[in-house]
């Protein structure tokens, strides 16, 4: 039969940190599905892009959207290994540039949980977490991001996690508009994705 096209929007961090290295397996298991991947910075608009699915980060409470929980992804500060010595205690973040994403409250949530005193998140704003973490690797500042999505960089010693504390502000979800009837290709992708996590 003809190829079935499947269009999936995915936030960049999840694409790079999890999905891309596993897509080979999906393609070999489903050779008749042509997967179109649209990477989005942090926000995915299901209706505007006529996406079949969107993989996004949040609490899962989106209106008129069917959301399947993929995984939790707690956030923790990440920085260049060269900054580790300067970061013995959460209060030490006072002297650092704190790189921020469009999710403005995330740093406050972590700093509160860490009991950090007198630390104000001041630093450049990024619209893509993956780019923000890249900037942190170059020593631009400290990023707040899910370590589980940057396991490779942490293992290779290109990135460091100065504190064990991670704060849970959301996770990754597979979402579709409730008004959209799932196609066989969509169901195949959903079954595959929820099984590999």
Q: Model-flagged regions — what are they?
A:
Residues 13, 101, 179-180:
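Short, surface-exposed acidic/glycine-rich loop or hinge patches that mediate macromolecular interfaces
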Residues 44, 48, 60-169, 196-197:
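C-terminal regulatory
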Residues 2-62:
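Central regulatory/effector-binding core of bacterial HTH transcription factors
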Residues 165-197:
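A late-sequence structural motif
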Residues 11, 80, 177:
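Residue-level recognition of the GNAT/N-acetyltransferase active site
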Residues 7-9, 54, 99, 143, ...:
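Short, well-ordered beta-strand segments
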């Amino acid at each position: 039969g003809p190829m079935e096209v499947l269009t999936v929007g995915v936030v960049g961090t999840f694409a790079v940190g999890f999905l891309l290295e596993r897509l080979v397996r999906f393609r070999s298991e489903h050779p008749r599905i042509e997967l179109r991947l649209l990477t989005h910075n942090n926000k995915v608009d299901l209706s505007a892009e006529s996406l079949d699915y969107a993989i996004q980060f949040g609490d899962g409470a989106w209106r008129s959207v069917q959301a399947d929980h993929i995984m939790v992804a707690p956030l923790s500060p990440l920085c260049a290994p060269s900054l580790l010595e300067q970061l013995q205690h959460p209060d030490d973040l006072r002297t650092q540039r704190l790189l921020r994403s469009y999710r403005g409250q995330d740093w406050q949530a972590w700093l509160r949980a860490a009991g950090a005193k007198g630390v104000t998140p001041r630093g450049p704003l990024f619209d893509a977490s993956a780019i923000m973490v890249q900037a942190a690797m170059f020593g631009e500042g400290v990023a707040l991001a899910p370590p589980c999505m940057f396991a490779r960089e942490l293992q290779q010693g290109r990135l460091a996690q100065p504190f064990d504390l991670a704060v849970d502000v959301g996770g990754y979800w597979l979402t579709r508009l409730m008004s959209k009837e799932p196609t066989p290709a969509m169901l195949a992708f959903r079954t595959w994705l929820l099984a590999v996590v």
